[in-house]
């Protein structure tokens, strides 16, 4: 039995991780975020009520769950407070159930200003960041000049460190990007306003999680974004700034890697991507590519980013990219989401290989974005189905063509599909194998 489960995306993000984490946390004591920031967007629908979380772990809607933000997360105090308010208005005791590592780097206004100024300067070569300061905050962390949650315990020392780092960033903003400087006084006053709140939620995350493990408590690690956006293993440079893969769990939470039991990879029954970067099976981008099937996927699937509101690019399921994700994460089983979006399509295609310019065929996706952009997808065509799968709760409720599609994905990837999502509500799910019971 796996007491410690990792839930992560195996595509380009937006796979539906939030719903699945919420579903599985019925049996969990802890839900831990270990990377990313408020660039994530996890949408939960419970009894018809929609909740979008960007920073707070998805387990916050469960009374039995303690939520933890690990050291691998870059934390925006402004975003956290904004997210806490509507939850507390609904009677959810966030301050009693949310805990933060003192080692979390802070995202401050100058990070946001720097992020946005850079994207403007890149012009047509823009990466497509959310503009929320994630990348610059991670840069400061690696450069060892970043401020962390723990620095808020000593505001006098915080003020000195802040002044030094802001001189560095403001010089770049004004002289290189021709943007306005960020006010030191305003940033400091804001920090004084939230210091007490943040420090009151600080715990020793490593010690807390290790004690939970020894007690036999079930722990869920909630990933953000997706494997193909990983800073090291994704389609670089069109990636995020953190390790979105299973390897990021230990580093981003301080939890021993040997204790991780089950890796649940979340994948849509098709593919989507937000922002720039290669996408071999792309059908629709709202501009140059206007395939009607791709438009169907985007419209029926409501493919707009929960964080940015941007239209997602859509395409066929890519088993080649999925094999890379399986290698990197040692995926135990899949959760296939949005199966119901495929309802009504006469035929479906699955990418089974990439043909290169020299005629060779790749069965696993390449590392570099440049190589990705040169591949031609090789497709296998399968019959679709006209029946309605929305809300199905058992395999018996699915048409045979849908079952065949799922089985083919299992054959092509070598990994079982243990969970199938057929709608946005936590109840609209088929659970073949429960990760905590595997």
From Swiss-Prot:
The keyword Nucleotide-binding applies. Pathway: Purine metabolism; AMP biosynthesis via de novo pathway; AMP from IMP: step 1/2. It catalyses: IMP + L-aspartate + GTP = N(6)-(1,2-dicarboxyethyl)-AMP + GDP + phosphate + 2 H(+). Its cofactor is Mg(2+). Binds 1 Mg(2+) ion per subunit. GO terms for biological process: 'de novo' AMP biosynthetic process; IMP metabolic process. One of its GO terms (cellular component) is cytoplasm. This is Adenylosuccinate synthetase. The lineage of its organism: Bacteria, Pseudomonadati, Pseudomonadota, Gammaproteobacteria, Vibrionales.
């Amino acid at each position: 039995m796996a007491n410690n489960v990792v839930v992560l995306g195996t595509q380009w993000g937006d796979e539906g991780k939030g719903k699945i984490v919420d579903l599985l946390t019925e049996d969990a004591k802890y839900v831990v975020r270990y990377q990313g920031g408020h660039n994530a967007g996890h949408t939960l629908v419970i009894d018809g009520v929609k909740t979008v979380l960007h920073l707070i772990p998805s387990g916050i809607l469960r009374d039995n769950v303690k939520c933890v933000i690990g050291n691998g997360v870059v934390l925006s105090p402004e975003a956290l407070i904004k997210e806490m308010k509507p939850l507390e208005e609904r009677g959810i005791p966030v301050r009693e159930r949310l805990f933060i590592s003192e080692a979390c780097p802070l995202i401050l206004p100058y990070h946001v200003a720097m992020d946005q100024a850079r994207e403007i300067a890149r012009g047509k070569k823009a990466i497509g960041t959310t503009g929320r300061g994630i990348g610059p905050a991670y840069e400061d962390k690696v450069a060892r000049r970043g401020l962390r949650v723990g620095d808020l315990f000593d505001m006098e020392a915080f003020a000195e460190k802040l002044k030094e780092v802001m001189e560095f960033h403001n010089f770049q903003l004004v002289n290189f990007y021709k943007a306005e400087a960020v006010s030191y006084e305003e940033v400091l006053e804001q920090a004084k306003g939230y210091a007490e709140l943040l420090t009151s939620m600080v715990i020793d995350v490593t010690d807390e999680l290790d004690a939970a493990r020894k007690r036999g408590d079930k722990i869920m690690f909630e990933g953000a974004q997706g494997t193909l956006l990983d800073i090291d293993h994704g389609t670089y440079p069109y990636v995020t700034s953190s390790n979105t893969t299973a390897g990021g769990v230990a580093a981003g939470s301080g939890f021993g890697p040997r204790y991780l039991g089950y890796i649940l990879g979340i994948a849509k029954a098709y593919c989507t991507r937000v922002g720039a970067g290669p996408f071999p099976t792309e059908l629709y981008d709202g501009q140059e590519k206007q395939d009607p099937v791709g438009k169907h996927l985007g419209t029926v699937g409501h493919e707009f980013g929960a964080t940015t509101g941007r239209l997602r690019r859509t395409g066929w399921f890519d088993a080649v990219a999925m094999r890379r994700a399986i290698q990197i994460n040692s995926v135990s089983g899949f959760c296939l989401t949005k199966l119901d979006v495929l309802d009504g399509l006469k035929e479906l295609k699955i990418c089974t290989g990439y043909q290169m310019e020299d005629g060779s065929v790749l069965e696993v996706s390449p590392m570099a974005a440049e190589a990705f952009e040169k591949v031609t997808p090789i497709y296998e065509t399968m019959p679709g189905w006209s029946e309605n799968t929305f809300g199905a709760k058992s395999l018996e409720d699915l048409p045979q063509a849908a079952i065949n599609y799922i089985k083919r994905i299992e054959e092509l990837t070598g990994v079982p599909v243990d969970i199938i999502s057929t709608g946005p509500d936590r109840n609209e799910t088929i659970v073949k194998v429960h990760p905590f019971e595997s």
